[in-house]
């Protein structure tokens, strides 16, 4: 079940995925549509997960789950990786490369 990102408790579990390039407007639309559908239907052990997502600085996708509502399991986390692979393939940007390091220099990331 999707909730507003700002309503997710601070103690929630989060994953931050970074892109190898800035998201275009089209990328953001695709990410929003796919992520919206995903978090609205995301489940663990046949129980709804209270989840949300946010795009930050046109380069990061943040996914959050309120584990106080229902705990997340390994299969559900794996399912989220399928979403990331799908988004990466669709927008032709790598969101799963752990060797990418982003940093801020002034207002530039």
Predicted regions and their residues:
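"Short basic amphipathic alpha-helical interaction patches in structured regions
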Residues: 74-84
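Non-catalytic alpha-helical scaffolds and adjoining flexible linkers that form interface surfaces
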Residues: 86-88, 108
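Short, conserved secondary-structure transition motifs
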Residues: 101-109
């Amino acid at each position: 079940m999707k909730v507003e990102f700002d309503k997710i408790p601070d103690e929630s579990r989060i994953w931050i995925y970074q892109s190898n390039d800035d998201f275009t407007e089209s990328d953001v639309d695709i990410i929003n549509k796919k992520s919206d559908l995903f978090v609205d239907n995301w489940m663990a052990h046949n129980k709804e997960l209270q989840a949300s997502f946010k795009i930050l600085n046109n380069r990061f996708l943040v996914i959050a789950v309120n584990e106080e509502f229902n705990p997340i399991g390994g299969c559900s986390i794996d399912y989220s990786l399928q979403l990331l692979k799908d988004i990466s393939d669709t927008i032709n940007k790598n969101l799963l490369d752990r060797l990418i390091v982003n940093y801020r220099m002034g207002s530039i990331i």
